Regions:
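Alpha-helical transmembrane segments in inner-membrane proteins
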Residues: 1-338
Length: 338
């Protein structure tokens, strides 16, 4: 027991250390390098009219916070979905939930921009949430008829392709200016984040994460089976609805602000469980949030510095590091069944 507790404490300290290091690199490294002295002077309020102040305060700090918040949200969303479906390869990207959110956001974005209207953060989140719930509805209908998770995943991928195809069809008939805006968003990126957007995503992500953490005990009971959860007084029907609602809000918030981001929701929860050496939700949920923040900060740093000033899409980088984890999980799972 003491060894397990010590391991969890060390794991949390490691993630916090990596988070601080990556945050420091994120604000200092880029097309324009900023020294520690520059950052210290800017944060103290000196020389607010300088280019360095604009780069740090208006570009890098909001982007840093967005990557951390949305990375944590996506990882937590993945863990909730894996709990709901009782399978480690469930996630918002694989099940087509992110693509559904992307489709509805694209439709609303083209509608707003086509009429010369400003599309605020609230409209983006509501559109993404509607898309997430529609896709989740299709997945749940299929899940009732299909017992094999592999078939459900294939169906989720097909839903993702259908949503992407419809999105491409809609974009074909959109105005050129709308296509540029939609293309930049649909590639997946934390760039262009403003302080107003950071405030909105904080107001959405933090309360939903806290609610998810408060569900740690019923999640722990549910992981041992529905009958066991009922014996402890858990209203399973309401509990499952809450899981769907919370995971959809988190994934919708990510899609609304950063576009579709792949593999974070699948890979990070599994890596966190291995790192902490436990599957207890009271440990894994905050671990997932920290792990997702670290993973997305690292991926964002790679995406904007590897070929600077050209930026890669965030999904390209997360796929490179996340897909091998998923492959390893599937091979390991197949080997365990033999």
């Amino acid at each position: 027991m003491k060894n397990r507790r010590a391991r969890c404490q060390l794991a949390f300290l490691l993630l916090l250390f990596l988070l601080v290091i990556l945050a420091a690199l994120s604000v200092s490294v880029g097309s324009v390098s900023l020294s520690f002295q520059d950052i210290q002077a800017i944060l103290s309020g000196a020389d607010r009219e300088s280019t360095a102040f604009h780069i740090l305060w208006d570009i890098r700090l909001p982007r840093l916070l967005a990557a951390a918040l949305l990375g944590g949200a996506l990882s937590a969303s993945g863990f909730l979905l894996q709990t709901f479906f009782a399978n480690p390869i469930a996630g918002p990207f694989v099940l087509g939930i992110s693509s559904g959110a992307k489709l509805v956001v694209a439709l609303v974005m083209i509608l707003f921009l086509g009429k010369g209207l400003f599309m605020g953060s609230a409209a983006m989140i509501l559109a993404a949430f509607a898309g997430s719930m529609i896709s989740m509805g299709f997945v749940l209908v299929i899940a009732r008829r299909v017992r094999q998770m592999s078939v459900l995943v294939v169906c989720g991928v097909m839903i993702s392709y259908i949503c992407s195809a419809i999105t491409d069809f809609v974009v074909t008939f959109a105005d050129d200016s709308n296509i540029v805006n939609l293309h930049n968003w649909s590639m997946g990126s934390f760039s262009g984040t403003t302080w107003d957007q950071v405030r909105v995503m904080t107001a959405v992500v933090i309360p939903v994460f806290v609610l998810s953490f408060c569900m740690a005990k019923p999640i722990s009971a549910y992981q041992l089976g529905e009958e066991y959860a009922r014996s402890l007084g858990v209203n399973v029907k309401r509990f499952r609805a809450e899981l769907i609602l919370l995971s959809s809000i988190l994934s919708a918030c990510v899609t609304a602000f950063a576009g579709p981001v792949s593999f974070v929701g699948i890979a990070v929860p599994q890596l966190v469980k291995r790192l902490f050496g436990t599957a207890k939700p009271i440990v894994v949920i905050p671990g997932c949030f920290l792990g997702g923040a670290v993973f997305c900060l690292f991926s964002d740093l790679i995406s904007r510095t590897m070929f600077a000033p050209t930026e890669l899409s965030i999904s390209s980088v997360t796929a490179v590091f996340g897909a091998p984890v998923v492959i390893w999980m599937m091979i390991r799972r197949k080997g365990a069944q033999r």
